[in-house]
Every structure is written in C-alpha cells, then in structure tokens.
Amino acid sequence: MSDVEENNFEGRESRSQSKSPTGTPARVKSESRSGSRSPSRVSKHSESHSRSRSKSRSRSRRHSHRRYTRSRSHSHRRRSRSRSYTPEYRRRRSRSHSPMSNRRRHTGSRANPDPNTCLGVFGLSLYTTERDLREVFSRYGPLSGVNVVYDQRTGRSRGFAFVYFERIDDSKEAMERANGMELDGRRIRVDYSITKRAHTPTPGIYMGRPTHSGGGGGGGGGGGGGGGGGGGRRRDSYYDRGYDRGYDRYEDYDYRRRSPSPYYSRYRSRSRSRSYSPRRY
C-alpha cells in the first residue's frame, strides 16, 4: 500500500471517529427528548381521564339526587293524598257550616216538647175540616186560630192540623183530654208543637211547576184559618215523575247532538282509526 492510500484511510477513520462522538449525543438527545415527552403525555392523559371520571361521577350523583328528591316528593304527595283521617276530623267535616245549623232552631225535643199554646193534631181523616176541629177544641178554651194543612196540588188534606189557643192552661187541658180521641172514624194524636209560633202554609208533596189549567192555593198562614185547595184537572203522571224541568227534553237532546263533549269526540276519533275497511274483491 502506498503512502497516499494510507493517509486517505487514516483520514476516513479519523472523520468517522470524530463524527461518532458528536453523533451519539444527538441520538441521546433525541432519546432523552422522546423519553421526557412521553411521561408528560401520559400524565396529561391520566389527569384528563380522572377529570372526566370525576365529572361523570358528580353528574351521576346529581342525577341520582334529583331522582331521589323527585321520588321523595311524589311519595310524599301520594301519602298526603291517601291520608287516613281520624274520627274527630271526620266529625268536624261532617258538621255543616250553615248559619241555621249553628243555632238551635227549636227548644225542647220531639219526644218531649215544652208546653205552649200551639197544639199539633195528627192522624186526621181527609174529610175533617177546620170547622170540625174548632167545634171540638173550643170546648177547652178560646181559640186564636185553626190551620189544616192541605196539599197544594191536589187540594186534599194531608192528615194533620194546628190549633192555636190564647192561654197555655187551655192548651194543656186540651192535650190531656183530646189526645187519643176518635174523630170522623180516626183516632187522633194531640201534642205540643215544637216551633211555638204560627205555621206558614207548607208546600205539600208536589214541588214542581204549577198546573197550566189553573188550580187552587194552599192552606192558611199565621193564626188564621187555612184556605182549601182549588180545582183544575190533574196533570199527567208523566209530569208528576219530574220530567218537566223548565225546558224541553228534545231541545236538550238537540243541543247535545250539536255540541258533543271532548271525551265523546276523542272516543269517536279513536274508534275510527281502529276500524278496518271491508275487503273488496
């Protein structure tokens, strides 16, 4: 080998040796860079993952808390609706709050009324008149009035009357002697009236509209004698059953046909959607 070739070979080796120390640090640097970057990325990823997990947990806790509060509120409402009232509360609710119920209308009881000048006569015959009662009870003292109660619709007696005395001693004697007496084939019962005042004419059994063909009025009021019922033809039993309510049934039916209820229209729309058309061959 010549001197020139040896020099070239040595020059290459020196270059390669000079490059190698400078090259290795670059690789080390790159390796160190890659190594330093990768842990930071892993830590960031783990932090983001932990944050997302904590957020999801907090959200789930919020939702579960909302559901729990809603379920508790619903259960509380159901409990409040299905509350069993005590007997005392029911008794309070059963009492009416009308002004007439707060005060006692009558003194005494029906079984044992207090003595007064007004006597009630019960169990009378339909043919007993006020004149007959006046003849019977005037034996015990002066009377201020007699009132036989009549039915306003039929004009017939309802089987009882009220006799008014001027003095309470006379009414006591009349009750003791006339109670159980037979009058016009009927055994009558005499007792003190509870109200202790003059009786207004009772409406009778029929509470509907008056007859179109006239008819008489009811009994008398106050302390005076009562008035009898009047004539007029009887109405058909169709109206006595309460079908005459101030408007025609057919008008009401026509109104219902023109404006059906929303429930009825909803039901018809459902039935139409479910109905199937017949097959055509």
From Swiss-Prot:
Main location: nucleus
CDD domains noted in UniProt: RRM_TRA2
Protein modification: Phosphorylated in the RS domains.
Keywords: Acetylation, Isopeptide bond, Methylation, mRNA processing, mRNA splicing, Nucleus, Phosphoprotein, RNA-binding, Ubl conjugation
Residue ranges with Gly residues bias: 213-231
The keyword Zinc is annotated on this UniProt entry: no
Protein name (Swiss-Prot/TrEMBL): Transformer-2 protein homolog alpha
The species this protein was found in: Mus musculus (Mouse)
Gene (UniProt): Tra2a
